[in-house]
């Protein structure tokens, strides 16, 4: 339904969308030239006023949005004429361009509180109706600037149960499921008359560590946990190969990814040695008594609980008794934001990782909740310094150097323990064709999908 000024390509760099050009005449100024002739769903043309309204909300102190943190450096946004917009920064911020490829999407000038009841965008589909906890109905927008969709519209159904989604797909009441079937159910469709599309995804599963915890603030304990986890086994058996072992928050597709950063291998003997060094010797040899006890909070989703059980067993093998506690996601998330945890397991999803500035929002010392996502209260002055240098750098090569150095330190400090990056998976009925999955796994490609027999 909506578009941003820019999109991201397969290499996660920005590419034109509603904007056709971006100029950066000085470190504090970005000039956007809009694509002409772009129509909103109600027929009026996109202009600079709509862009100014949308981004003006990001710097309005009274406006509440989870996306405002990405625009902390934005000072002002000004319409120069109908098709040109000037963004002025408070300080140099080299990651600003990629922020224009993420949320917020552009909305019409003056959109108010009732906008959610009948949203209007510039995307390939327009809103028809919405039923809470049931479905969203979208119709093709024939005047879409990127070409009208090749189908008659989309109905997005809400099916909260994994098994139900699989059964509905099997019997034909739905045509397609994207990234919403667990590996065991995907496996049931293999070798049958269904299309299964896969692509390397960005979603990132990790253990978050409370760096203020008296036990876990010892890096030797964190490393002992890292060496005790067999990621390859989790990927192969639990994920059925629909993931790859992760090395850090920056995905391998990203231009700033450093393939040489420190990585944990599966080494339970090294784990036991580190626990000995940290003052947690084995109290009874091969007996049942643990070296220490820790707790892990997870959501009560089945996949999360199964993975936690596997990790629990792997840690038990080195003498760590892991108390796994599962909650409704909202309850668990509130605990995490408030620092009420020793460890937690969550995922970063898709587009959040398209630019390495995510490292600042997650690991910079002052980015603790509610200001940012440093939920474990990680604090390393050298990482802060490197991220400041990366943010002020004027070339991609400079940024990559500083981000690479920061990644190395973060990996060795282990405030996160990486588990896997998801493989994007779409399972479609044989009547569909033209499906392509981009790295973020979003629904943009639906406009090119056709359905035979209709």
Report residues per predicted region:
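Surface-exposed binding/hinge segments that line
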Residues: 23, 33, 67-109, 129
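N-terminal lobe/hinge region of extracytoplasmic solute-binding protein
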Residues: 1-26, 34, 56, 120-121, ...
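Gly/Pro-rich hinge or "lid" segments in bacterial periplasmic/extracellular proteins
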Residues: 13, 92-93, 98-149, 153, ...
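Ligand-site clamp/hinge motif
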Residues: 110-113, 141-187, 312-313, 321-323, ...
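Long beta-strand-rich cores associated with HINT superfamily self-processing modules
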Residues: 426-454
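Extracytoplasmic/peripheral linker and loop segments enriched in polar/acidic and small residues
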Residues: 235, 273, 317-332, 346, ...
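Ligand/substrate-recognition segments at binding pockets and active sites
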Residues: 278-351, 396, 424
